[in-house]
């Protein structure tokens, strides 16, 4: 695979920089970073950028989208081949603005990127995860938002040093102002990094029955996830535990499903697990088409038996 001359990275979520650098170093000969403050500049320095550009803040409550004009002015002068962003809500909003201002092709939620005969090709899901599309980008600049857990994080070298430059703030024509920020309760789980996950679906009859699910997860040293109806319909679990096309994409070694039917929208998130074990009382449930191991049975009988056996 050939490499591009330069790839630039930006993320509104600092935790995503390691993944972005992992991809950028694979696809570009030189990698440049754009960050929002000097603390982030120091954090990404060990990832090996050629130079770090620090965005000048106009306001402590600045919204990410407002940096579009500042970043566009910078990139017009530098002529990169690719701008790589984290596929967050803010990241995709910023990418859309940059795509218009720089007349650049944009691919959101990319699951794979390749350089073929000097052209950037990016793969992404479509039709709610029913299919994948591969886009061949012909514009001089490609803007790609990278889905989480697609790339392995890059290694860090604490001895690496590079210059930093400040990017002047260019106010957008219509500035979106944030008046106040309030911290929400932090989630205690990141399922995308979990090695083992127990997922629960509509086969669970009551919220109190989550106790046995958590008990099984504890025995397996696993995290607990769920299908969309449990998180957004019943509100039995936090949104961060929802596995699916618009939720978490698993990369776990094991995914044990309890009472999950296996609709495609859910399996887009669960199919990345190395081993899938399904327990469902409906022998015709679609989940068994994805499972490496399947058991037709009532989770209210199977789960207590598993806990008993695994606790010995």
Regions found by a protein language model. Give the residues of each.
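N-terminal glycine-rich FAD/FM-binding segment characteristic of electron-transfer flavoproteins
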Residues: 1-312
């Amino acid at each position: 695979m050939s490499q591009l001359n330069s790839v630039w990275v930006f993320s509104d979520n600092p935790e995503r920089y390691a993944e972005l650098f992992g991809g950028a170093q694979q696809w570009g000969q030189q990698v440049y970073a754009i960050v929002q403050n000097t603390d982030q500049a120091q954090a990404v320095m060990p990832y090996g950028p050629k130079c770090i550009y620090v965005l000048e803040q106009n306001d402590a409550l600045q919204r990410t989208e407002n940096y579009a004009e500042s970043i566009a002015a910078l990139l017009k002068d530098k002529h990169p081949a690719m701008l790589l962003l984290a596929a967050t809500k803010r990241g995709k909003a910023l990418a859309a603005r940059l795509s218009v201002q720089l007349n650049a092709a944009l691919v959101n939620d990319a699951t794979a990127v390749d350089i073929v005969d000097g052209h950037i090709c990016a793969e992404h899901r479509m039709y709610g995860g029913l299919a994948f599309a591969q886009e061949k980008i012909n514009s001089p600049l490609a803007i790609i938002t990278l889905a989480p857990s697609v790339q392995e994080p890059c290694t860090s070298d604490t001895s690496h040093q590079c210059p930093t430059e400040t990017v002047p703030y260019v106010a957008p024509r219509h500035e979106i102002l944030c008046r106040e920020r309030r911290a929400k309760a932090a989630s205690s789980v990141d399922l995308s990094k979990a090695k083992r996950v127990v997922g629960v679906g509509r086969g669970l009859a009551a919220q109190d029955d989550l106790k046995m699910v958590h008990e099984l997860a504890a025995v397996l040293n696993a995290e607990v996830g769920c299908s969309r109806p449990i998180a957004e319909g019943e509100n039995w679990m936090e949104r961060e535990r929802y596995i699916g096309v618009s939720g978490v994409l698993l990369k776990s070694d094991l995914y044990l499903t309890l009472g999950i039917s296996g609709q495609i929208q859910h399996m887009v998130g669960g199919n990345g697990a190395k081993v899938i074990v399904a327990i469902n009382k409906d022998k015709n449930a679609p989940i068994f088409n994805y499972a490496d191991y399947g058991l037709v049975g009532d989770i209210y009988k199977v789960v207590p038996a598993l806990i008993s056996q695994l606790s010995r």
